[in-house]
């Protein structure tokens, strides 16, 4: 199997299949003079068994589907990683990405990707003892929800432009329910907890005074949101550079921005108000809202929520557009 690069198609650099494992095996499995092609489907079938510690024909088929959707290298032409979630972006009518240099383009069949998730669920009771399996399932679920969020956002925008308040209300309600479910899915993994990141920052300041602890947390909050002050965030385009899909950040940072945007659009549809701010004024208002969170010190858990991923998966798939 020839590769010019390794594809990353799950939400923002959180990979499910360890592409590097395959990449290294392609290079170093034999001497350079004796390199032979690797059958990716056969390799993935063995990888699924090694990763999950149990045999599952459904998991093998799921990996095959993932290879032809999110891990299809021919679909990755953007060079800036995986598609970014609209939930993580500053709210707008047209969203091309969350970060300035990313993309929100999803080039694969979303429903085919969901089929891979359904396949992963088939042997849930057998595979649930595998931490790798639970990570992969959570990782895929947040991508399912991210894909559906994009469809909900598009429908909200269309309803607004057609001045259809009923449809706008319907899909904005669905959108926020989806964000809530995303928060729950993320909360099942320590890797996806804001609290893990903030605790790590404060631990780096161990042995120093309270000011230094707070400074480290301030920097940790800024790095994953505004990156810096107004100039860096807006003029420099660095806001939402990392746009992490993390529990805590999703509920307390991304969701309030969308609540504000939806409230403004609804007020326009009902004739209660008109948003007359310039684009620059809107950007400055977003920054002020974001900066308030950066300066905050609200605690976030660094332990998982203990929710059942199978139940969350069924809810996530039911959201499918």
Which sequence ranges carry the predicted segments?
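Substrate-binding groove of N-acetylhexosamine-processing glycoside hydrolases
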Residues: 1-321
């Amino acid at each position: 199997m020839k590769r010019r690069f390794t594809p990353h198609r799950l939400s923002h650099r959180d990979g499910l299949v360890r592409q590097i494992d395959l990449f290294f095996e392609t290079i170093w499995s034999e001497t350079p003079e004796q390199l032979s092609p690797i059958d990716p489907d056969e390799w993935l079938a063995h990888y699924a068994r090694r990763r999950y510690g149990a045999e599952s024909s459904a998991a093998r088929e799921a990996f095959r589907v993932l290879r032809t959707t999110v891990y299809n290298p021919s679909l990755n032409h953007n060079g800036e990683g995986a598609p970014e979630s609209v939930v993580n972006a500053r709210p707008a009518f047209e969203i091309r990405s969350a970060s300035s240099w990313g993309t929100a383009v999803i080039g694969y069949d979303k429903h085919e990707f969901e089929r891979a998730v359904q396949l992963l669920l088939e042997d849930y009771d057998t595979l649930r003892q595998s931490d790798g399996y639970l990570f992969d399932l959570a990782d895929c679920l947040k991508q399912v929800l991210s894909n559906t969020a994009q469809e909900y956002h598009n429908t909200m925008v269309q309803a607004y432009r057609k001045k259809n308040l009923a449809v706008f209300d319907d899909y904005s309600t669905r959108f926020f329910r989806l964000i809530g479910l995303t928060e729950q899915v993320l909360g099942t993994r320590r890797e996806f907890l804001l609290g893990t990141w903030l605790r790590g920052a404060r631990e780096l300041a161990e042995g120093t005074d309270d000011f230094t602890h707070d400074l480290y947390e301030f920097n940790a909050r800024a790095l994953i949101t505004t990156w810096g002050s107004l100039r860096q965030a807006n003029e420099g385009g660095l806001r939402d550079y990392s746009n992490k899909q993390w529990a805590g950040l999703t509920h307390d940072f991304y969701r309030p921005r969308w609540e504000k945007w939806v409230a403004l659009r609804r007020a326009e549809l009902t004739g209660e108000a008109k948003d007359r701010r310039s684009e620059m004024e809107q950007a400055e208002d977003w920054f002020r809202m974001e900066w308030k969170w950066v300066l905050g010190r609200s605690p976030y858990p660094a332990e998982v929520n203990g929710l059942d991923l199978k139940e969350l998966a069924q809810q996530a798939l039911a959201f499918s557009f």
